[in-house]
């Protein structure tokens, strides 16, 4: 067990995305471009949904909450990375590292459960349209969002506390641009067998929403293919296409990072984490708005209102 005074002075070195200065300069410019787009894009989604009464329904309520989580999610890591690069420093305190890890796990899990809630919403809308307003009532939507936040934080807390109990002696270079649980476990000189088992349990909890999404879309597609109208099938696929794209991007990159043995992790994997920590939150507003006429109309209305005022 580490001494209290040691934990207060312990610092980690964030190696960045690649560890090569020339490439780090490229990623600095990339993040400098990505971060404001992420903030503005997701904030516009939230404002458009709040300002347009036609979008005050469960589907857009869940989307607005997803956009808020994406804003927080990208803000946990990118500002620190930009500040470190600008100041020529790569250090992060032990407390700052634990805080970053906690919010990454909590927000990542919350994001995945909201995606599952959105899939459930689509399944109910398509397979049980007559009961939609009853099942997806305002109270149900609030419970879905609250449950997502509770599960996300409940999954993050034990991992953070367990990591706080570890001893770190010798190499303190984190093979990533933020404090992730995998490189931290590899740095520890404590017995991490229990911690690794808990990490994979956490991965299992994180995978539950994916199972819910798969079940929801099996229900959607089984209902859709029973519809004789080709127009109805195309409309259903158009409605679900954006969500499926986001789910594929998010879970595809996350699974590439965490669904494998701890010993296989290296700095090369930091490039994969850029996809779900930075790129996916930036793309979400575009994916959900470009193919959605109601969202595009709400955004135009929002812009016109700002210009006229």
UniProtKB/Swiss-Prot annotation:
It comes from the Eukaryota. One of its GO terms (molecular function) is olfactory receptor activity. One of its GO terms (cellular component) is plasma membrane. Glycans are attached at residues 5, 264. Its main location: membrane. Disulfide bonds join 97-189. PROSITE patterns: G_PROTEIN_RECEP_F1_2. SUPFAM superfamilies: Family A G protein-coupled receptor-like. Gene3D superfamilies: Rhodopsin 7-helix transmembrane proteins. Residues 1-25, 80-100, 159-195, 259-270 are extracellular. The keyword Ribonucleoprotein does not apply. GO terms for biological process: signal transduction. It is a multi-pass membrane protein. Residues 50-57, 121-139, 219-235, 291-309 are cytoplasmic. Odorant receptor. This is Olfactory receptor 1A1. The lineage of its organism: Eukaryota, Metazoa, Chordata, Craniata, Vertebrata. The gene is OR1A1.
């Amino acid at each position: 067990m580490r001494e209290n005074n040691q934990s207060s002075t312990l610092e980690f070195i964030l190696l960045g995305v690649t560890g090569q200065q020339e490439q780090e300069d490229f990623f600095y410019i990339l993040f400098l471009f990505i971060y404001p787009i992420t903030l503005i894009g997701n904030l516009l989604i939230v404002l458009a949904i709040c300002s347009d009464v036609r979008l005050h329904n469960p589907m857009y309520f869940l989307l607005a909450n997803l956009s808020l989580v994406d804003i927080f999610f990208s803000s946990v890591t990118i500002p620190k990375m930009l500040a470190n690069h600008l100041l020529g420093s790569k250090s992060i305190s032990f407390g700052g590292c634990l805080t970053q890890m906690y919010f990454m796990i909590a927000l990542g899990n919350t994001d995945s459960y909201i995606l599952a809630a959105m899939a459930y919403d689509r399944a109910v809308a398509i397979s049980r349209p007559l009961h939609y307003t009853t099942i997806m009532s305002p109270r149900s939507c609030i419970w879905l969002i609250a449950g997502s936040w509770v599960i996300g934080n409940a999954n993050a807390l034990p991992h953070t506390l367990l990591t706080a109990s570890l001893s770190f002696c010798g190499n303190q270079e984190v093979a990533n641009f933020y404090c992730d649980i995998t490189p931290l476990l590899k740095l520890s000189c404590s017995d991490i067998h229990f911690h690794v088992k808990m990490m994979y349990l956490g991965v299992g909890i994180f995978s539950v929403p994916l199972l819910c999404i798969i079940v929801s879309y099996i229900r959607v597609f089984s209902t859709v293919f029973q519809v004789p109208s080709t127009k109805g099938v195309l409309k259903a696929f158009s409605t679900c296409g954006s969500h499926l794209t986001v789910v594929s991007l998010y879970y595809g990159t996350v699974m590439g990072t965490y669904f494998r043995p701890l010993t296989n992790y290296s700095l090369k994997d930091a490039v994969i984490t850029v996809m779900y920590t930075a790129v996916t939150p930036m793309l979400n507003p575009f994916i959900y708005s470009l193919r959605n006429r109601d969202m595009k109309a709400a955004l135009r209305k929002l812009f016109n209102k700002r210009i006229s005022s």
